[in-house]
Amino acid sequence: ARDLYDPNLYHKTYLVPPAGHPDYWEEIERIVDQHNIEMALVQPELEVLTWAKRLEEKGKLPCKALLPGYTLAQQLTDKGMMTDILKDTGWVPPSVLIEPDSDTLAETVAQLGYPFWIRATSGSSGLGSLKVENEAALRNWIHINPKVRQFIGSQYLPGRNLACKLLYFEGQLLRAACAERVNYIMAKVAPSGITGNTSFGRLLNEPGLVDTATQAMDRLFAHAKAPKHGFFTVDFKEDAAGQPYITEVNVRHVAFSVCFAAGGATFAEDTVRLLDGDATFDRSYRMYEFEKDLIFLRDVDAQPLLLRESQLLN
């Protein structure tokens, strides 16, 4: 990646073993010690799982980090497991697990009917995602995604694609904010149109969405017997009538966090102040509210823009 070599973005970059590798922690600890690193922003999902597991097993980390409990992280990075925990709440769409080698594939997806939405149960950036119109398309999609061990099929939801960010710290929900993903960077290279990187989005004020997200998180915390601690992005998709359903819960910041910050939702700064024990930080709950009509535009290797939707060229 070009930007890894840009000294204006990073003081130093390293190539390290992947999370889970036997030499991973030795290298991470060496870097932390060498640079006296006090805090880490841990992502993507595999890194979060690895760090959360280390914290659970060892009781400490090389430096401070805001992490969910390990069991909770496991449940949330598996979309099938997360959906199953919430299946009786009305907050998730009707869904079925799809085993690629199953002899009852047609019978399984018949519960949903066509079209439906398919994706991998784990992974990010829209891995394995497609609107499936018929059985032939389903079988072809499974065939060209041989590395996906399990899919989840869900009711097709044609409405808005929403995200609700939630910052929990030591048992309290402290900050929240919402946005809409409208278009994706390089959308044409993915059959589903979803690449995981938003190119055009809206910053929204949606207290009802926050309410649903926090109720769902309450159940997920309880199921995992986990403390309310960590940073989460709850993704929603609306049906044709505008009813939102939870499609996944990310255990990390998402790519357009900088756009939230530009609009005033400074989650990264909040996290640093909390981890640093800043006594002046206001721990009363706050949903960040944005000015009306705010949108953001992003692209590869370019600074994002924040402007009003009314300013877009017609």
PLM region descriptions:
Residues 155-161, 165-222, 250-275:
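ATP-dependent carboxylate/phosphate-activation module, predominantly the ATP-grasp catalytic core
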Residues 35, 207-314:
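ATP-dependent carboxylate activation and anion-phosphoryl transfer catalytic cores
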Residues 92-94, 115-117, 127-160, 217-224:
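Conserved ATP-binding module of the ATP-grasp superfamily
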Residues 13-20, 96-100, 130-133:
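Short acidic-hydrophobic, aromatic-tinged amphipathic segments that line or gate anion-handling sites
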Residues 59-128:
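A conserved helix-loop-beta module that forms one wall/lid of the active-site cleft
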Residues 1-67, 103-106:
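ATP-binding N-terminal substructure of ATP-dependent carboxylate-amine bond-forming enzymes
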Residues 31-37, 111-112, 146-147:
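Glycine-rich phosphate-binding loop signature in dinucleotide/nucleotide-binding domains
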